[in-house]
Amino acid sequence: MGEETDRWQRHDWWGVVLDTDDVETLTRFYAALRGWRVHHLDETDGSLDPGEGVAYLNIQHNREYVRPAWPTQSGEQQMMLHLDFEATDLYSEVVRAVDLGAELCEHQPQENVRVLLDPSGHPFCLYVS
């Protein structure tokens, strides 16, 4: 097996980009929720480094951002994606997420999953496997 290349020197990074009208709030929310380092933050975008692998989460300012509806409603802004995060203790992770600024959704389609909305209204899930 060959020598591994430092993750910062690799050219196979990939990421997810979330639009928002409040870059700082959303960047700091996900940094606190996941314990990820804020790699970059200004008024136009924020970038989070999870610390291993080659994936990242980027938060991008969009002046025309509209919060998606959850659950989905005809004629309303649809969610484009949602993030899933595994939890060790679902109850305590939900409480922590709400304390950080998330909103627990009334509609919960699965027993071992909790759907929440981040401060910009993007649905995300906490789950136990």
What are these regions (language model features)?
Residues 7-61, 93-95, 99, 105-115:
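Core segments of cupin and vicinal oxygen chelate
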Residues 9-12, 74-80:
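Short glycine-enriched loop/turn motifs at secondary-structure junctions
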Residues 55-73:
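Conserved, structured core segments of small domains
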Residues 76-91:
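Mid-chain, well-packed structural core segment of small domains
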Residues 110, 127-129:
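Residue-level structural signal for beta-strand termini and adjacent loop
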Residues 118:
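Short, acidic, Ser/Thr-enriched surface-loop or helix-capping motifs
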